[in-house]
A protein has these predicted regions:
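Mature extracellular/passenger domains of Gram-negative fimbrial/pilin and adhesin proteins
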Residues: 20-239
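Gram-negative bacterial Sec-dependent N-terminal signal peptides
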Residues: 1-21
C-alpha cells in the first residue's frame, strides 16, 4: 500500500510542470453583526434644552394655571448610527414621582422647583413633527405595551410605551406589529404642545400652577421661581 501511494505522489510531482494551471476565483464573504454605535446630536448622551425664557410673577393667575401658549420652543433630535438598524425609544419623567394636582396624565412631564425638586410647580408636554429616516419622510408610531392615560393623540409624547420610526402612522398597536424602518440617521423635530387642542394631535401646552396652588407648596412668587423638568428618551435597536 505504501508503494502505491508513493508512486502516485511522485507522478503528481513530475507531472506538475507539464499541466496548465487553471484560474481560480475565490468568492469570499465578509460580514459583521453587532449592535451599532449611535450618537444623539453628535454625542453619546445629549441634553436638548427647551428654554421658556423669563416672565414676571405678575403674569401667574391667582387661581388658574398659567399656560405657555405664546411661545414656540422646539429642537431637532438627530440619532446617527454607524450601521443600519431599527430604532425605538421609551420616554420617562425624571420628576414624575412628584405630586401634581392637575393634568396628571401620561403626556405631562413634571416641572419642579429647582431649589426644592420635591415640589412640582407645573408640567410640560411634547409633540413631534417632520420625522425622517436617512433623509426620507417617515413617521413615529406608538405601541400599546404600556397603557396611557388622558386623551390619545398620534404625535404626542407619552411616558411608558415604545415608540419607533415607521413607514406608516400607527397608534396603540402591538410592539411587534410596528412597521419599523431600518436606517442609519433618524431625525425628528420636538416642540412643546400647543395650547389649542385639535384633531392634528396638538396637546394643551406647558403650564405653571396658580399662585394659590404654589402657595400651598410654600412657594412665594415674589421671590421668583426657577423651575426645571426632564423628559428622558431611552433608545433601543428594535423592540
Amino acid at each position: 500500500m505504501k508503494k502505491v501511494l508513493l508512486s502516485l505522489t511522485m507522478l503528481a510531482i513530475i507531472s506538475t510542470p507539464v499541466l496548465a494551471k487553471s484560474p481560480v476565483a475565490n468568492l469570499k464573504i465578509n460580514g459583521d453583526i453587532k449592535p451599532p454605535t449611535c450618537t444623539i446630536n453628535g454625542a453619546t448622551q445629549s441634553d436638548v434644552l427647551f428654554d421658556y425664557g423669563r416672565i414676571s410673577p405678575s403674569l401667574i393667575p391667582q387661581s388658574k394655571i398659567y399656560s405657555y401658549s405664546g411661545i414656540v420652543a422646539h429642537n431637532v433630535v438627530t440619532v446617527e448610527c454607524d450601521a443600519k438598524t431599527y430604532l425605538t425609544f421609551v420616554a420617562s419623567d425624571t420628576y414624575g414621582d412628584t405630586k401634581l394636582s392637575v393634568n396628571n396624565t401620561s403626556e405631562w412631564f413634571h416641572l419642579v422647583d429647582k431649589s426644592n425638586p420635591e415640589n412640582a410647580v407645573g408640567a410640560a408636554d411634547f409633540i413631534w413633527s417632520d420625522a425622517t429616516v436617512d433623509g426620507k419622510p417617515a413617521f413615529i408610531s406608538r405601541a400599546n405595551d404600556v397603557a396611557i392615560t388622558g386623551k390619545a393623540y398620534k404625535n404626542v409624547l407619552y411616558k411608558g410605551p415604545i415608540y419607533g420610526w415607521t413607514s406608516e402612522q400607527q397608534s396603540d398597536v402591538d410592539k411587534n406589529a410596528l412597521a419599523l424602518i431600518s436606517g442609519q440617521v433618524f431625525q425628528s423635530n420636538f416642540k412643546h404642545g400647543n395650547a389649542n387642542s385639535n384633531s392634528n394631535g396638538n396637546s394643551n401646552g406647558t403650564f405653571i400652577l396658580s399662585k394659590d396652588e404654589l402657595s400651598k407648596k410654600g412657594i412665594d412668587l415674589s421671590n421668583g421661581l426657577d423651575f426645571i423638568g426632564e423628559a428622558v428618551l431611552t433608545f433601543n435597536f428594535g423592540v
